[in-house]
């Protein structure tokens, strides 16, 4: 597919949208010319206890990086997500929970959610949890995880959600870094028909002597599986709720007080605890949720992420609930019990908006039309993509097969550190180009710079930076502001460096080319791995591809590609040659792969991110330097790749 393919805004979408093109242009212009005025007006969507007088106090100067929004105002996040909705929509559904087993589901109204949050907030207070204390949440995708987050917000405790797929060692590192006082977990998790020993993992994590800050472990009963019990430390969630009052006054919190810490995955060394604060984060999550997804009251909105990632925080919990939306919480995986699961959930719950990851889209696409067999899908109005750049072929399949050419796709780009979406189409305002995140959201000023930090104008490729602050921006790394400054503001002074490369086309649309550390330098030519991967996946026999650089005597770096074929396709030397020629045709001879390794699967985190670090190590035969692979969705993939690599080398 040509990158120039353009999908204009559909007239029926433009006629009913919250934000048409003229509105977008006017609002964006105001947001960058007069950010104080723009955000002062937008902040009225929140309920304040003490109104703010000052809007924006921010500096990107690397000698004094300081980010404050609405600093003298006070409010409570849980109040904004629950209490203020009770009068008008107390009996409306807040959360639809779909269990791992298709026979399990629950609907929870705003009134019911409010009562449970108040009870659990009181229970936490009863366990000596107070404003500023850190609570670690290590739970499956069940409503109690959302309750725990909101209960912390209600009493001013800081939550640190750790994804349930992380190992005991990774969990311990995150507990130690923030001196967590309480850990909330479940007996076991359920995912894809398999049980995860969450409580046992917590027990193992807490054998580390440096986790001594933890005083209590609160355990939610999910499976009823047998677990070890420490009667001095462990408490059942349900027993706390049985005796707790459902009345709990929300704590008045300063706009810049900490709301949560979220540790970024995949980084080496000490975990990086991204810190988000109260008012700016909530405002930005709510506004982006409303405008990017063009959300209307009463619609069913489904983000398939896990609450252990920032997408789950902003677009399952805080954004939707602040807007009084109905948010769907899914415990399982897209291919269990079979590949039709996503389609069946859409029809079962009459989902209007689906926000998922390219990994899930490609998994469905690899099965052809099987994933939508027998599906109606007529409730869908809008599709979204998040987590990595989506290649044009997967975009087109998503648009044609899942959306039946009726649903715009919002291809969103953002990061844990940004708090919310920074670059994305708005359904009623933006003509779509498959593979492009298109244009910046209100208040966001993206730019491209060369490696010396010089701004690049017009159609070009470079390092993606943001020139000024926005309310959802992370304020620091927990307990390590110097590292925050060094990581994001030292590379290009006076700018926030995203770590991503991007291309801007002649229409001003942005195309994310991948992490800058995923840029190859082949014979002096810079190439994003995403570009080569997109070309490879465009081949009709290829389901997925991952590209890494390897040392090359002549070129400096060679191109090493791991290829997963579609179901029913067989690997062969002839196909290898065909794929090399295909990439030469799609991009040019410079992008021709030096090595192609067949892969039954790729090493991915549970959120679907490919762990390229592991692929690089395998490609260079550094089998003993892979690091911790326990966080992978399927650690067994790694040994298969190593064995195949050894066989290739021996041949």
UniProtKB/Swiss-Prot annotation:
Acetylated. Deacetylation by the SIR2-homolog deacetylase activates the enzyme. CoA binds at residues 191-194, 311, 335, 523, 584. It holds the Pfam family ACAS_N. The modification N6-acetyllysine is found at residue 609. ATP binds at residues 387-389, 411-416, 500, 515, 526. Its cofactor is Mg(2+). Keywords: Acetylation, ATP-binding, Ligase, Magnesium, Metal-binding, Nucleotide-binding. GO terms for cellular component: cytosol. One of its GO terms (molecular function) is ATP binding. Its EC number is 6.2.1.1. The keyword Hydrolase does not apply. PANTHER family: ACETYL-COENZYME A SYNTHETASE. HAMAP family: Ac_CoA_synth. This is Acetyl-coenzyme A synthetase.
